[in-house]
Amino acid sequence: MKSPSDRYKIIQELHQQGYSISLLCKTLGASQSGYYESLKRKLSVTKQRREGMKDKVKMLFLKHKKRYGRIRIHRDLLAQGIKISEKMVGSIMRDLGLKAIAKRAFRPKTTISSAHANSIEDLVKGKVFTCPNQCLFGDITYVATKEGWLYLSGFIDAYSKMIKGYSIEESMPASLVTGSLEKALKRFPKLKEAIIHSDRGSQYTSHCYHQMLTQHGLKISMGQKGVCYDNAVIESFWSTLKTECFPSSGVFETKAEAKAAIFEYIESYYNTQRRHSSLNYRFPLAAELAA
C-alpha cells in the first residue's frame, strides 16, 4: 500500500489534469485535510529555502559590483553546487530590488583610411576560430577624466575573449598600439603566426606597427573601409568595460584613478572572474585553459 505522501503526490498530479480533490481523496482513501496540510508543509519548506537563498544571491550581486544579472548569478550558484532554477534567482532579485547595471549601447566607430591600408586584406571575414592564439582583435578607445583624456589600446583573443595586452597613454602615437601588442606577445608566446586584426586607423597603418608584426611572424588583417562590425568583438568589450568599470557619469576624477580602475577590472575581474555569454558562461581564463 502506498504511503500517505505518495498518495498526496498522485492527487496533486491528477488534480492538475482537472480531477477534483474530493473525488481523488475518496478514490485513493486519503484524508482531504491531510492533503491540504501536506501542501502547507511543502510551501513552508520552499519558502524557507527561498529565504535562505536571498543572502547568497545578494552576496554574489554585491561581489560582482552589480555587474551580474540572473543568468550569471545562477551560473555562479550552480558552480558552487547549489541547485536552484534561473527563474527563482530572477524572482529573488526582483524581491530584493537587485538590478544589474544596464549595458551601454554598442556604437561602433569609423576610422580614416589611408592609401596603404586599402591594399591590406580582411583575413577574418567568415572565419570561425576554434582555439586561443589564432587571432587577436585590436582597437583604441577614449577614456575621459577631469584631468583630460586618456587613450586605451587593447588586443582581445577572438576565441577566449581574453584581453591579452593593453596600454594607456595620454596621446595616440603608434607606440600606444605596439606597446599593447608587445605585452600580449610577452605573456602569450604561442601567438606567433596569429592573425592580428584591426580597423584602418593611422596607428595600425604605421611603419613601426607593420614592422613589428613582420618581425614576429604575425599576419596583418584589416576590416573593410566603413564596415564597423568587422571589429565588433573588441568594440563590444569596450562597451562592457565602460558600463561595468567607469563611473556612472562616464568620467573619472583623475588619470591615476582611471588607470588603476581599468587595471583592476581587466586583470582581477574580466579575464579571471567574469562569465562570458559567448563562452557558455565560462571565464576567459577558463576558456584558455580548457582549449
Which stretches of residues belong to each language-model region?
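Basic, flexible linker segments flanking DNA-binding modules
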Residues: 2-8, 25, 32-131, 227, ...
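Mobile genetic element proteins and their domesticated derivatives, centered on retroelements
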Residues: 11, 24-25, 35, 57, ...
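RNase H-like two-metal-ion nuclease catalytic core shared by retroviral integrases
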Residues: 110-112, 198-200, 206-209, 220-242, ...
